[in-house]
């Protein structure tokens, strides 16, 4: 277990909050990260991975999934999207390929993000 200073990688320090509760320096652990994204940038699990924790990373975007596979080969990295029912669906990816959602016009997404989205 690591006793190095805890470095936050998460966008809003969610990893710090979790570390206070889960104490990753004192025990081994396991996570399931749905919408894992980049393995370092804004990652809630990067600091835990540095401390020997492993997990399942669910990430449907190809580029992000490839990064996860390269950086976290000991993890289970799944290139899938999760939903309420089994089957196949459509995934709309914004032009920067940083975000995706299950429909062409989700009400919780700004219009500018929906413009130019590609169907995957």
Regions found by a protein language model. Give the residues of each.
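Phosphate/nucleotide-binding beta-alpha loop and adjacent structural elements of enzyme active sites
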Residues: 1-120
């Amino acid at each position: 277990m690591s006793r190095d200073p805890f470095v936050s990688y998460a966008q809003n320090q969610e990893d710090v909050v979790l570390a206070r509760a889960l104490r990753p320096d004192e025990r081994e652990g396991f996570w399931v990260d749905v919408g894992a994204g980049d393995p370092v940038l804004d990652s809630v699990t990067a600091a835990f991975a540095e401390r020997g924790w492993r997990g399942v990373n669910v990430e449907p975007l190809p580029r992000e999934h490839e990064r996860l596979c390269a950086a976290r080969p000991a993890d289970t990295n799944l290139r899938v999207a999760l939903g309420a029912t089994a089957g196949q669906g459509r995934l709309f990816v914004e032009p920067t390929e940083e975000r995706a959602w299950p429909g062409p016009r989700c009400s919780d997404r700004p219009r500018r993000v929906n413009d130019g989205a590609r169907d995957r």
